[in-house]
Amino acid sequence: MPSFDIVSEVDLQEARNAVDNASREVESRFDFRNVEASFELNDASKTIKVLSESDFQVNQLLDILRAKLLKRGIEGSSLDVPENIVHSGKTWFVEAKLKQGIESATQKKIVKMIKDSKLKVQAQIQGDEIRVTGKSRDDLQAVMAMVRGSDLGQPFQFKNFRD
């Protein structure tokens, strides 16, 4: 029986490349001359620390980062940015978290959405991913289109498509 897995992963190497590109752009931009502004990617905690001298500049840096992530194939919705910007001394910063894996509440929404669609497929939660199996390849592709079209707050990838 054909099957595939629904996952939500961010390629850390591509994220590192996007952070490096954003840092290079900030160094060359006129509005960031003589300003302490930087990006730091922490691989262990999968966070990107955006640091600057004012909260307005932090928001500008976040826009630059989102644009660079999008160019590297990482959707902006995979970046979880908290609302409040932390002020410490003369710097402002925010720690944006890269979303890895699908949360259990989102997994349950996806499984319920698949079951409500009345397609002849089964969905099982397996750790951070969802395995979808069915008899017809067309039904599986319909599930893929339905999950892509849903607005659940994070991007999804489809892996291990087996016939």
From Swiss-Prot:
GO cellular component labels: cytosol
Ranges in a coiled coil: none
The keyword Coiled coil is assigned to this record: no
Molecular function, one GO term: nucleotide binding
InterPro entries: DUF520, UPF0234-like_C, UPF0234_N, YajQ-like_sf
Family in the record: Belongs to the YajQ family.
Function, in words: Nucleotide-binding protein.
Protein name: Nucleotide-binding protein YajQ
Species assigned in the record: Escherichia coli O81 (strain ED1a)
Protein's gene: yajQ
